[in-house]
Amino acid sequence: MKRRALMAAATAAFLMGVCGMLQAAPVAEVISYGQSGLKASDARIHEAIKQAAQMRKWGIVSDKPGKVLLVYPTNNRSLHYQATVSVTYGKGSYKVEYVKSRGLDEKRNGCYGKEGVVCVHRNVNRWIANLGKDLNRILSQSY
């Protein structure tokens, strides 16, 4: 009986460890709009960034010419976790880059055995990808 309980506890601990590892993923980069071949003015890209941020409920922390700093989420969940991204734009294109996070399992010194790779909770990549999709859709509607 003791052996069964010990085996069950060991299995549960192993599965919890594996599930925890599956939560982290390397940060992905969003392909910029300018690489699609279409061009938009900097003013139009800036407006699209603000629209997409509002649609996805990202908060604007800093808004300077050529660079907008966004955080997600902006509701009560932000007390527990938050991701920060930078959207740089100019010359008809933009780029969404991960900056930092809090409470999202960030590992800056490498993950999955790869040095220099930043890993965060897998949802961060989805949030960034959705923001990028909305930006591309908004900018594509301009033409």
Residue ranges with predicted function:
Residues 1-10:
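Bacterial N-terminal signal peptides that target proteins for export
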Residues 5, 20-24:
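Extended, compositionally biased intrinsically disordered regions at domain boundaries
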Residues 9-18:
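Bacterial N-terminal signal peptides
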Residues 23-143:
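Ser/Thr-rich, low-complexity intrinsically disordered terminal regions
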